[in-house]
Amino acid sequence: SALVQKLWNYCNILRDDGLSYGDYVEQLTYLLFLKMADEQSRPPHNRPSPIPKGFDWRSLLKLDGDDLETHYRHALEELGKRPGMLGLIFRKAQNKIQDPAKLRRLIVDLINKEEWSRLDADVKGDAYEGLLQKNAEDVKGGAGQYFTPRALIAAMVDVMAPQPGQSICDPACGTGG
């Protein structure tokens, strides 16, 4: 899809700075979470945002240069300290995009231009799957396998909180990581 291609093209720009595909998908996931939380807090949804003011999407849009990079790094750190699901999502999160101009471009030119909450779930899923597929093709020589980032696996295990002796079935998980 055009969205996957747009996301992938930007990934290639960041790759030139030494950012791995896994790091790109991880950073994209954090930023999309913040953007979609912001969208859900606005009309027509008007839901309370789980993101504390000052660490939210709008705070990122107001900054650029080193101020943006410093604020984003601090926001990830603070969000990782929050209780509940929010803390789990951002636990051990780090900014891997060291060039503030590229971080700003990712935020303003790529992510902010889309209304992600209005996109069909299939479109978002296809975009994420497309990135993982392109990653697998590029990194693994086209093995056709999708590799789930370790941080995502750890977050899913924390959310499910399996007890010893319990099994969790996900028929779509392939090898399970």
Q: What are these model-derived regions, one by one?
A:
Residues 1-164:
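Non-catalytic, mostly N-terminal accessory regions of nucleic-acid modification and defense proteins
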